[in-house]
């Protein structure tokens, strides 16, 4: 399974299915691609209705025929545009083409519907994308129920957890490997991933990627 960080919170997961999470590309100064270059996608996941997460999700779904998995209120909007959707809510699970997607708690705000994180099970791997969130004890449930092989955790502070809270989130979620996200896209979310890695220590393997770089999860 190949994991590519597209900048900000946008992730591409290439396995038996092609999955995009929070594909904010247009207007993203850190983006490593553009939506018009994406011609293959099976599932697009959106964690919440902020522009830097909902991003280009509708366009990608319309261009590729991908199924949009997201909170109910966004799903209703997308369905009205002819997009295939799987709407859900926190605590729920959907299965799309053999891929299990669980929606979990996030502490944040949103324009429409509630913010969320997601846990994705595919090809024998379990991935946790926290979305935009503060540190919350609910992350302990992610660890207890799912034991993620790889987690994507925001570290940019101000609008999400900063480095100290994200370090604790690694512990709570029992993450084996972590890719920091949602940092250094804009001046207001500047953070040092090296400092994050140092503070995590031997709790987990921290993988620092540049936008466009990939990591093979085995």
Language-model features, listed with the residues they occupy:
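Active-site neighborhood of phospho(di)ester-bond hydrolases with catalytic His/Asp-centered motifs
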Residues: 21-22, 41-49, 68-72, 128-132, ...
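Active-site environment of divalent metal-dependent phosphoester hydrolases
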Residues: 27-28, 50-55, 75-78, 93-95, ...
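Short gly/ser/thr-rich secondary-structure transition/capping motifs
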Residues: 1-5, 24-32, 84-85, 131-133, ...
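Binuclear metal-ion centers of metallo-dependent hydrolases, dominated by the metallo-beta-lactamase
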Residues: 79-92, 167-218
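Zn-dependent metallo-beta-lactamase
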Residues: 1-18, 25-28, 95-98, 102, ...
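Active-site-proximal loop/helix segments of hydrolase catalytic cores
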Residues: 16, 108-172
């Amino acid at each position: 399974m190949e994991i590519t960080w597209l900048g900000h919170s946008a992730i591409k997961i290439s396995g038996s299915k092609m999955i995009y999470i929070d594909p904010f590309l247009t207007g993203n100064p850190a983006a490593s691609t553009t939506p018009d270059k994406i011609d293959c996608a099976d599932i697009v996941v959106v964690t919440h209705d902020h522009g830097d997460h909902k991003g280009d999700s509708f366009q990608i779904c319309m261009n590729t025929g991908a199924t949009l998995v997201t909170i109910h209120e966004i799903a209703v909007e997308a369905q009205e545009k002819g997009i295939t959707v799987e709407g859900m809510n926190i605590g729920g699970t959907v299965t799309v083409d053999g891929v299990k997607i669980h929606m979990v708690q996030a502490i944040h705000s949103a324009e429409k519907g509630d913010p969320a994180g997601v846990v994705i099970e595919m090809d024998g791997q379990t991935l946790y994308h926290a979305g935009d969130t503060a540190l919350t004890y609910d992350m302990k449930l992610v660890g207890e129920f799912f034991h993620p092989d790889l987690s994507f955790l925001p570290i940019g502070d101000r609008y999400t957890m900063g480095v100290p809270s994200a370090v604790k989130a690694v512990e709570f979620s029992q993450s084996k490997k972590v890719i920091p996200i949602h940092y250094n896209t804009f001046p207001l979310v500047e953070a040092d991933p090296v400092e994050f890695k140092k503070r995590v220590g031997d709790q987990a393997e921290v993988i620092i990627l540049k936008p466009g770089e990939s990591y093979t999860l085995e």
